[in-house]
From Swiss-Prot:
InterPro entries per UniProt: PPIase_dom_sf, PPIase_FKBP_dom, Trig_fac, Trigger_fac_C, Trigger_fac_C_sf, Trigger_fac_ribosome-bd_bac, Trigger_fac_ribosome-bd_sf, Trigger_fact/SurA_dom_sf
Statement: the UniProt record of this protein carries the keyword tRNA-binding: no
Catalytically driven reaction(s): [protein]-peptidylproline (omega=180) = [protein]-peptidylproline (omega=0)
GO biological process, one term: chaperone-mediated protein folding
TM region(s), chain numbering: none
Name of the molecule in the record: Trigger factor
Recorded domain comment: Consists of 3 domains; the N-terminus binds the ribosome, the middle domain has PPIase activity, while the C-terminus has intrinsic chaperone activity on its own.
Ranges of residues in domain PPIase FKBP-type: 165-250
PANTHER family on file: TRIGGER FACTOR CHAPERONE AND PEPTIDYL-PROLYL CIS/TRANS ISOMERASE, TRIGGER FACTOR-LIKE PROTEIN TIG, CHLOROPLASTIC
Function: Involved in protein export. Acts as a chaperone by maintaining the newly synthesized protein in an open conformation. Functions as a peptidyl-prolyl cis-trans isomerase.
Amino acid sequence: MNLEVKKIDTANARLSAKLSIENLEKRYDKIAQKIAQKVKIDGFRRGKVPLSLVKTRYQAQIEQDAQEEMIQEVLKNAFKELGIENKDLIGSPNLTKFEKKDTHFEIEADIGLKPTIVLDKIKECVPSVGVEIPNEEKINERLKQLAKDYAKFVDTDAQRKAQNDDKLTIDFEGFIDNAPFEGGKAENFNLILGSKQMLEDFEKALLGMQAGEEKEFPLTFPSGYHAEHLAGKEALFKVKLHQIQAREALEINDELAKIVLANEENATLKLLKERVEGQLFLENKARLYNEELKEKLIENLDEKIVFDLPKTIIEQEMDLLFRNALYSMQAEEVKSLQESQEKAKEKRESFRNDATKSVKITFIIDALAKEEKIGVHDNEVFQTLYYEAMMTGQNPENLIEQYRKNNMLAAVKMAMIEDRVLAYLLDKNLPKEQQEILEKMRPNAQKIQAG
């Protein structure tokens, strides 16, 4: 074996090797013997099949297994020469050449190594943080909203006309071309006007109706409607209004506090205001982080934390981004890429910068998470997906299974870890007085929920 190994940098190495044809052929008998012990061929007892017959019938498999053995031997020798073990690798080596010549094989491969990351410049990367403290006006607005959310609906007199924020009980049925359509009918359906639970034009058509009244009205489904068979279609709806209920106003006082903070002993309006202030503070912080500071922090980490990246992982990320992009392309563009290898290569190459940044940030986040002992439990991943399913009207178990089948659970967990690491760094950079506010408010702010 003629082997040459070159370490390009701390995260990359390359090997080139030449092996004689005999190196491959000498493996045939041993591999054929292994196959002969397992296969069953008519006319022969198991384990008694002649090697000549096995070699003839399983020639392709024997040659493939021999090549794989030869490649593994080359890699083993390359690792030994580099002074590395499997634990030092990141991903699998990328075989870039395996070519058979007249007398020998030529093999080339790129090897990715776990990068060395120094985190001594992290503090320089974290932008200054200042969260808006909720003022009295914002607190009062939230208290009014809570009073509205927790108000009970009560029956109204027969003369009342339906208005926004009323709760209606209706029967409805929709028709397209004089025929009912799937999902277009319901009885004793509860709808809060103005909630956008139904299409805006549907809710507007109910304004001013009275209990016992029936009404017909046309409605055009939006062109981007989620049910494709209805998108852009004109429909006729027939509606019967059975009941109108209005919210019974709640006063903002200690009684409201006892309703909102039902699990809190001796709840008072003063305590409720403190809880509201805490929740608003956390909301302001989350908005500032998500809309501005996290992206700024990521840009700084990318710029200031310098280390060698394994090119094999960057190439894999480019492949992933390219494949994902294909799903959102028009059929004509996909066809154009399929017909031109040069165009496809150029398109894939356009993702190199994004792939490099993504790989780099992932390594940095992983290193920070280990250093600060920040993690995410599998149950938290499932809870996140369960919430996503509830918000999108999907079956939670089906959604989780879909993520599992597509090997996407690890990506969800990594995204959650990234979010926690970035928030942790930003929280540490809050002014001291705001850190104290955060520590005081964090345990209690989640106790306030919508009614």
